[in-house]
């Protein structure tokens, strides 16, 4: 899968939970352009997961079984929850 339309990816970042909207949109705005092509694909795939699952992963430290999604979750958490 190739990332052809960045604005469509951005639109897909919109979630039904405010907390996820803030975390995922901020990550997209700050970090998406710096991801490798593989990481971009992992990120887009992660967006297909439902909100409750992503919320558990990002807020309650649930570990995804999928290693690719786990990597993106780790990047999002590092970006979102760093206080530097």
UniProtKB/Swiss-Prot annotation:
It is found in: Cytoplasm. Keywords: Chaperone, Cytoplasm. GO terms for cellular component: cytoplasm. The keyword Chaperone applies. Pfam families: Sdh5. Its main location: cytoplasm. The keyword Chaperone applies. This is FAD assembly factor SdhE. It comes from Wigglesworthia glossinidia brevipalpis. The gene is sdhE.
